[in-house]
């Protein structure tokens, strides 16, 4: 649709770059393969009763929905004019001029004029990743006298995304173009549908 702010940003924002978590594509494919295997077991090569098959179908629907919402969908769209964030049940678009600061500790969190925005596609490093990060990885990202945290390392999703964002923010003043209007769209229907499948999966689990 032409009035879709995210799509309009993708088409008109300039030099679009879509960021996803490392391994998101692999985990998405593996998740769907697992669900397909369960579906085959339940309905093609199965001796389960009809009620058990219905219960398995509810569980498969919940798992498939989870793979899509939590792994496949989350992404960050970087453009010259602004940023678009797709979280499991929301889509946010804003101009770089609306960004005040970036935090990378747990997930990439954008401190904006409209409030904090957390990006599911860019999580911070785990404890094991903290141990693998070498101080040399952070030298090129040193910003003046400010201390650089492990979460800012390009080896973490949050650090890599923040690095791209800072480059785009610095370049925004050089780019002429329309001001990107802030838009926060909550996908309540998807959230309700997900809650229903979760409840059905829970009931199905106890009926197996």
Over which residues does each language-model region extend?
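Interfacial loop-to-helix junctions that mark the boundaries of transmembrane helices
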Residues: 48-52
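Conserved beta-hairpin
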Residues: 63-96, 100-104
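Single-pass alpha-helical transmembrane signal-anchor segments
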Residues: 35-37, 55-70, 197-203
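A membrane-cytosol interface segment of integral membrane proteins
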Residues: 116-180
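Acidic, Ser/Thr-rich low-complexity segments on the non-lumenal side of membrane proteins
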Residues: 94-125
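Short leucine-rich amphipathic alpha-helices used at interfaces
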Residues: 54-55, 70, 76, 120
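N-terminal membrane-targeting/pre-transmembrane regions
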Residues: 1-47, 163-208
